[in-house]
Amino acid sequence: MYATYIFPRLMDWVLRGERFQTERRHLLAPAQGVVLEIGFGTGLNLPHYPRTVTALHSVDPAPLLPDRVARRVAQAAFPVHIRHVSAERLPYDDAAFDCAVSTFTLCTIPDPASALRDIRRVLKPNGRFLFLEHGRSDDPVIARWQDRLNPLQNLVACGCNLNRRIDQLVLDAG
């Protein structure tokens, strides 16, 4: 019940804040063509995609708050296709997308390295990967606290990891 109803509403409320909306607008400004979004959630990115986006395909392992998703999808300026599958095995052809997007998702994917490799596979040769994530701090004091708090965070935030080195994972995936 918590993971299905309470946590998604809490995250939708937190991530709707103006600071996050500003970050989304900046992140998504270069998106164009056919876009793959990893971790659709409740669709908070939808209003921030530019007019250069012609279609959005998204993967998310579980449906979240279908009423909010339906409302946001209905307001989109382009077709939106959502599949409830894992990001580690994307059900798309090689080089199918002009752009891929991930916002606050790589922290929860069980095998982010596999997901990033598969994202690279489905991107066209000159495709762009746009991401907005949190991860392990470079400050050793903060990093130690992230390590200490990670088990609790993982439990209360439905699999979110505070201490992943997202930047390194992205670089390693190419």
At which residue positions do the language-model features occur?
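Conserved alpha-helix/loop element of class I SAM-dependent methyltransferases that forms part
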Residues: 14-34, 44-48
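Class I SAM-dependent methyltransferase Rossmann-like catalytic core
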Residues: 1-18
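A short SAM/SAH-binding and catalytic strip from SAM-dependent methyltransferases
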Residues: 98-111
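A short glycine-rich, Lys/Arg-flanked "PGG" loop and its adjoining helix->strand segment in the class I
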Residues: 113-125
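Class I SAM-dependent methyltransferase SAM/SAH-binding core
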Residues: 36-38, 42-89
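Conserved beta-strand signature within the Rossmann-like core of class I S-adenosyl-L-methionine
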Residues: 126-134
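Short alpha-helix
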Residues: 158-174
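A short acidic, Gly/Pro-enriched loop at the edge of an enzyme's catalytic core
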Residues: 88-100
